[in-house]
Amino acid sequence: YTSEDVWNAMSSLAEKDLTDQLGIAPGPANGFTLDMIECFEKFGDVMDWAMIILNPFEPWPGQHVLPAAQKNGVKILTRVVDYGGVLHDDVKPGHHFRDGDHRTYRPEGWVDHACEKIEKIRPIADKHGLSMIQLACQWNLAHGPVESVVPTLIQEAGPDAKPIEDKLDDLAALPGENLLSAEEVETIRKIGDNTGCMALKG
């Protein structure tokens, strides 16, 4: 997606009304920050959207593409705002993941560490009357070019798991205005800071 030939071809699709939106969604892994910044700088004038991984517990490295997106007029759609389901608040320490669940390949103890962080940011959610997933969505949307969030919806195993319908209702009740102060956004970022957790790609 940093190839001029690719973007010339993509632009021709838009010119022929075969699409009304152009964008990129690198992945499924994280860390394509350098390539994305280069792409925004070279082709931002023909790009509408880009999808990145961003959430309160994974601010890095996605946060570094945001200034380039803002500068070049690229709208950002953020996925995995729920941090592997933990921010839906029904994945707790000792949680049993179903066989084949991709989250079982994460480092041991990731749920425990995430739940510790949840308790540190819960007072901010409580102050504003937000659930944890609503707080995560508001945090993402507080960043300039972010215009949409895409949580993952998984029916978790176990008797205490929230039904997917309840998770959808929770998301539908997200306030239209952002309730977080700049100080609260930064406090959450510091609590969730994951700087250097992977090698950057590109």
PLM regions: where:
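Short, well-ordered secondary-structure micro-motifs
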Residues: 1, 34-36, 61-63, 87-91
